Amino acid sequence: MVLGVVGISYREAALKERERAIQYLQSFEKNLFLAQRFLGKGGAFIPLLTCHRAELYYYSESPEIAQAALLSELTSQGIRPYRHRGLSCFTHLFQVTSGIDSLIFGETEIQGQVKRAYLKGSKERELPFDLHFLFQKALKEGKEYRSRIGFPDHQVTIESVVQEILLSYDKSIYTNFLFVGYSDINRKVAAYLYQHGYHRITFCSRQQVTAPYRTLSRETLSFRQPYDVIFFGSSESASQFSDLSCESLASIPKRIVFDFNVPRTFLWKETPTGFVYLDIDFISECVQKRLQCTKEGVNKAKLLLTCAAKKQWEIYEKKSSHITQRQISSPRIPSVLSY
């Protein structure tokens, strides 16, 4: 009975490969028989799907078989995943949650993404003690590491890179912006731009949008309206927008379209003309070119988190052993234990 993870991140895989991985791993949530096929009876999983990584954390009573089956299936789809089991799985999630494995060293958004993935999995499926322990300890250690060590206040962020791009295309504070969707990244970019004097911001979302932004209902949305820059950060696909097409996007001269979605909102067969289209990989490359992080700082962070992971792994092994003994004597035990 072992915990494991298979997945890919921005380090190993381009956007197209991450899209395929996300679409495949999403199928586990839609079809629980698929999960049982790979993980076996009693198997459980939590997907962690973000713009920059697609991972499946799993529990299986036949870990070697489960890992081999998952790797084989992903490889057959042109995906080259990494994999970790046991202590290595703990160490990996601890480093991911702390932000030291992120595109921007120490960024805080990943902590929330890990927490939401865990809560979603807990709400939708019965999870074993093992996955609860792994995620709760990763969130705890990640938070403690941030408060104890602290990270540098980065000058380079996705938001600042977006502003640089806008300036390079001669977009001013009088530019009209449309944000489609109320995702984390859309909110962060909008807040950053507003703080820097870009006040002509409109949101179109099914969620409630807070001030100071203007809002637009889906019924009145038209991509032929004079928005100079459009940001897509919605969970909805392009087919769900009746007026969305290459022609409607190109209807406004010199328009810029940022596509933050993964999988992307658009899968162009050819590079579109009539407007500038920038996806999340383009933004990520711009961020990486501007970032400077010392190797010494990264190695120190990895060492500290590896030690924390080893400590929690040893605790997990003891608790897991006790649970196994209790299962032998009593078939009914709580699915979530306090520790």
From Swiss-Prot:
GO molecular function: glutamyl-tRNA reductase activity; NADP binding
Binding positions for NADP(+) per the UniProt entry: 181-186
Active site (catalytic residues): 51 (nucleophile)
SUPFAM superfamilies attached to this UniProt entry: Glutamyl tRNA-reductase catalytic, N-terminal domain (SSF69742)
Residue positions binding substrate: 50-53, 102, 107-109, 113
Subunit structure: Homodimer.
Role of this protein: Catalyzes the NADPH-dependent reduction of glutamyl-tRNA(Glu) to glutamate 1-semialdehyde (GSA).
Protein name in the entry: Glutamyl-tRNA reductase
